[in-house]
Amino acid sequence: MSAQDFLVELGTEELPPKTLVSLADAFLAGIEKGLAGAGLTYSAKQVYAAPRRLAVLITALATQQPDRSVNLDGPPRQAAFDADGNPTQAALGFAKKCGVDLSEIDQSGPKLRYSQTILGKPTTSLLPTIVEDSLNDLPIAKRMRWGARKEEFVRPTQWLVMLFGDQVVDCTILAQSAGRHSRGHRFHHPQDVRISSPAGYLSDLRAAHVLADFNERRQIISKRVDELATQQEGTAIVPPSLLDEVAGLVEWPVPLVCSFEERFLEVPQEALITTMQDNQKYFCLLDVDGKLLPRFITVANIESKDPAQIIAGNEKVVRPRLTDAEFFFKQDKKQKLETFNDRLKNVVFQAQLGSVFDKAERVSKLAAYIAPRIGGDAQRAARAGLLSKCDLSSEMVGEFPEMQGIAGYYYAKADGEPEDVALALNEQYMPRGAGAELPTTLTGAAVAIADKLDTLVGIFGIGMLPTGSKDPYALRRAALGILRILIEKKLDLNLVETVKFAVAQFGAKIKPAGLAEQVLDFIFDRLRARYEDEGVDVAVYLSVRALQPASALDFDQRVQAVQAFRKLPQAAALAAVNKRVSNLLSKAEGSIAQTVEPKYFDNANEFSLYSAIQQADHAIQPMAAERQYSESLARLAMLREPVDAFFEAVMVNAEDANVRANRYALLSRLRGLFLGVADISLLG
């Protein structure tokens, strides 16, 4: 079957840069779906996206649908004709349904059948609907109308190119009649651009100063920004999201180096970086020590004959924003950070839980409780907790919300607070996302855990549990943050006691009954998904969860040990034995004795197992004391042979009550050794 290349380009006013890639990908996906539904084959696909256009190129697209056969089965033959061979209403109705005379129906089989060959339609007749459906299905949060038209799209449409081979596909979509003329750069080539063929699309636009390939523009910007940064003896800060956004803003990227006055470097560099990145879309430069340089890179959308004019314009635009940041910083520093606390008394944290000031006081007490238990200083943690929310009422954070914690750090430093106290004001918000940086100080870790735990206990205490995708207080993230800090920083904190302490801080504001258990379950349940992401089988998680360890670090150490145990050749058999023993013990009548009496042994295999258990118990006691769980399980794996021999030769439920009870005690002792690490029976 013959094939031709297909190109569709929708021209618009400037598209939202942050959603440009997602719109383009969805456009391609919609066209792929339409082609698949129509049974049209092709050899390759490519999507293009620029500020004023979305385009898809399909290579070697079949020129026509394949013919297809359709078989329709009707009523059984005996129901289609009466005894005299005359057609019944069932037969006549089937023929009418097929739109043919009964004579055209196949009557040779057990059922009437009508076979029809449906000729494939020309691809050109199918493409308009495929393209239109794809555009209508784009993930656009809010569509707009323009002029007096009824059509809606993310931005007003301006032109439409649709070529199949060398021919224009005749159609009208979103108020635009298809043609072969695109448009070039607004300034370099404001005239229409004739697209010679689908394959020539990129080169035709390149000649008109438009780089339609998003990835090409992104690579050009990234490479040139790095080159310019090196020339300035610095390193560019290039967040992927900012790079994507800038690539979505320009059709012909030209990076240029600009500068600002060095006096602004007295302002916390995070504030300067925030305003330059978020508001101006600039790439900031750092020196070898990670300090901000008084220069930045802007990406122009024009190759100017006078780049100095563009540079001067950007420097003029950024100056007021930097001046604002400087003003807020100086205003805030006129008073000590601690004085901002009073303003927080009028800022509501949550209506039922009190003000942000109340929260800071709770965090202070909880951090002081946590700190010495993880090796930190209680007084410094208490101080950091008390100051933790002060910067929320500062001018700087009011203008730049992203500076919360960071501003507090600089103000605390200026006030002469200890370094770890100042750092804790920023580290309280760590980790700020999945895989993000963790606190570097024990004071910071204590405050970070306290802040998150206070939120969890408080919100759970008033019954506002997260449901489905709704989690307005980010409780899942808070729980994961606590776990990451404790596990990855190897901090051994008893969460059971800590949560109880946190509950007590709220007094009558919450309902304490069962609250601690509810919060603990929520926190430890987060570990299930964490381990699944790491490739740990859920059975391993459940085997440890059954023991309800109080420490997240201890929980993790047990999981790692069980994960290693599962790889041992004895693991499956011992898991099955533990399950068998667990079932036997659950059916035991009365209480099981705590001690084993060798005098009731009447089988050599009982003696062998008892001796092996004694030796194993003696060997793993020092391991258990040091939480060497992997070593403990490896040692217990050596019990497989005496355990197997015991069950092959010994009837546990002996007729003699003393013998039977003693065997239960022996098995209970065996199971207890494994339960020192995890419930291995759940691995089976």
Curated annotation (Swiss-Prot):
<keyword id="KW-0648">Protein biosynthesis</keyword>
<dbReference type="InterPro" id="IPR006194">
    <property type="entry name" value="Gly-tRNA-synth_heterodimer"/>
</dbReference>
<dbReference type="GO" id="GO:0005524">
    <property type="term" value="F:ATP binding"/>
</dbReference>
<dbReference type="InterPro" id="IPR015944">
    <property type="entry name" value="Gly-tRNA-synth_bsu"/>
</dbReference>
<dbReference type="Pfam" id="PF05746">
    <property type="entry name" value="DALR_1"/>
</dbReference>
<dbReference type="GO" id="GO:0004820">
    <property type="term" value="F:glycine-tRNA ligase activity"/>
</dbReference>
<keyword id="KW-0067">ATP-binding</keyword>
<comment type="similarity">
    <text>Belongs to the class-II aminoacyl-tRNA synthetase family.</text>
</comment>
<keyword id="KW-0963">Cytoplasm</keyword>
<dbReference type="GO" id="GO:0006420">
    <property type="term" value="P:arginyl-tRNA aminoacylation"/>
</dbReference>
<keyword id="KW-0547">Nucleotide-binding</keyword>
<dbReference type="GO" id="GO:0004814">
    <property type="term" value="F:arginine-tRNA ligase activity"/>
</dbReference>
<keyword id="KW-0436">Ligase</keyword>
<dbReference type="GO" id="GO:0005829">
    <property type="term" value="C:cytosol"/>
</dbReference>
<keyword id="KW-0030">Aminoacyl-tRNA synthetase</keyword>
<comment type="subunit">
    <text>Tetramer of two alpha and two beta subunits.</text>
</comment>
<protein>
    <recommendedName>
        <fullName>Glycine--tRNA ligase beta subunit</fullName>
        <ecNumber>6.1.1.14</ecNumber>
    </recommendedName>
</protein>
<dbReference type="GO" id="GO:0006426">
    <property type="term" value="P:glycyl-tRNA aminoacylation"/>
</dbReference>
<dbReference type="InterPro" id="IPR008909">
    <property type="entry name" value="DALR_anticod-bd"/>
</dbReference>
<dbReference type="Pfam" id="PF02092">
    <property type="entry name" value="tRNA_synt_2f"/>
</dbReference>
